[in-house]
Each structure stands twice: as structure tokens, then as C-alpha cells.
Amino acid sequence: MPPSGKIEVAEEGNRRKGEMTPSEMRQCATDIVAWFTQHADLDAKGCDQSVIDELSKKRDVPLALEELWREAATDVWFEGYQLLHPQSIGKMLSDIDAPYVPFARDIDDALLVVGDDAVYEYEMGDGRGDRLSSSIADYLEAYRNKLLEGRFEYMDGDGCVETMASAPSRGK
């Protein structure tokens, strides 16, 4: 019998349907911090809940970000962006347009912010830039997966850089 021309793609693995649950967000934060503990000698110290609550009074803080801060308040890197302590964020909010909450900064003071649950790049003089992810939970999960797949290595003071083995082929 000739093929029908119909192609079916088999999806492997255990894909989640819908948003992350609170326990999945907690596990994601734990996995990210564990990676930095192992690869960057991170001495993880979570943030006191009262500090997170104080920030939450000023801006809407997504649960996925709260879970990360409960595990580690600083020294986690998102490639070249370092996680900001919630206390320092509270002091920055007067310079950042609402509803955005900065959560990481690079060496040039560019920020990663979350607003309306999406993740964006943010420049202090220019405001919101490119959208990086539709939600902070998706952003953290994708980053965690890349860390655990061995696609990044930690470079002291520079953050995480993509490993050569995972870099796209440049051709001949």
C-alpha cells in the first residue's frame, strides 16, 4: 500500500500541558540553584520571605521568581545577567516603569525584567526592549533545561557561557 503522504511526528518524553504548578516552579528553582552550587561553588542563601513580601507590596512579583529567591538571593546567572537581591530591586523601582520588576543585571547595567508575567530586556535610558519569553516560569524552565543538558559552563565573574559543544554549527 503506498504511503498516504501524511507525516506523524512522535513526541517523546513527558511533556507538560499548561502552566507550571507551584511545586514544579519550586523544583525548577531548586535545580537551577543546585547547578550553580555544583558548577560555581555557590553558597546558596535564600532571601527572607519578609523581604520578598516588601517587594511584592510595590510591584507584582510572580511566584516562579519568589521560589528562586527563596533558594538563592544572589549569585545565580542568566548567561551574562546576575540575579539581583530583592532588597536592591526595591531601591531601583522608582527608576523602572511599572509594571516591570527587574530581576537580573549585566555588567553594562542592562536588566532582565518581568512584567505582565513576560520576560524582557530593559535599558535604563530606553525602557523595555525585546521580549525573551512569554512567562517567567517558561524562561526559568528553559534555562534550567539548558543548564542540566550541559549547554553552559560557569565563568567566574562573567556568568554562564554557552559551551562549544552546544554552539550551532557555523558551516564551512
Question: Can you say where each PLM-predicted feature lies in the sequence?
Answer:
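Generic structural signal for residues positioned in beta-strands
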Residues: P102, A118-Y120, D138
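Acidic, proline/glycine-rich low-complexity IDRs
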Residues: A142-K172
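Compact, glycine/acidic-enriched structural inserts
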Residues: E123, G127-Y154
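A surface-exposed partner-binding patch
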Residues: P2-D116, Y154-M155, A167-K172
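Short, surface-exposed beta-strand/loop "edge" segments at domain boundaries and coil↔beta transitions
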Residues: D109-V113, Y120, D126-S133, V161-E162
